[in-house]
Amino acid sequence: MNFAAEGYNSFETKKTPSGVIKYLPDPKAVIGLIQSGKLKEHILLVQGGTTTFLAPALSMGAIGVITMSGAPESHLGILAREFQMPCVMTAYLTNSDTRYVTGGNNDAHFAAIIDALEGKKAQLHCEDRETGRVAILG
């Protein structure tokens, strides 16, 4: 299987959710997705592991999350484990050398990930203890 991105795995699971990746930059986007009734059709892409505004989506049945920063010990990593929801954290593109740098300017890194993943049908693979992976389908 060809993996477009990988990162830290928030917890080991055999669940392999698939859906269209949707970037959620702010609380308004989260509420809009919930109100659309299409939450369970999407894997959620967010900037950080401290993205607390994503909590309503988790409790309403989100199927999976990809973060561009943050660690399994972050707020979102803990919530993902609590909700038993696959979550790939601090994702990076496997065909790129760019990586998230703590305290650095990561705008280009974030933009590249959003551009490469948003709107793509994907499947999360979190069966490895340490590494979560994102496969693009079709």
Report the location of each language-model feature:
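Non-catalytic, soluble scaffold/interaction modules
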Residues: 1-69, 73-74, 78-138
